[in-house]
Amino acid sequence: MTPNKEDYLKCIYEIGTEVEKISNKEIASRMQVSPPAVTEMIKRMISEGLLVKDKSRGYLLTDLGSQLVSDLY
């Protein structure tokens, strides 16, 4: 896993502990990157089984994504 993906996983985890809905815009703001950059990374992470998109809650870590985050902390 790349350090960039690790940063995204940690960011998404941290946002999830603070707000109800994890949005593309929130991730971009916290990571200080453009929304299109977030969209591309999110697509990759969904295809790798690290995230899922929920209509009401935004982006959520899968069990695999959660496990990887716990390994990072």
Predicted regions and their residues:
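Key DNA-contact positions within bacterial/archaeal DNA-binding proteins
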Residues: P36
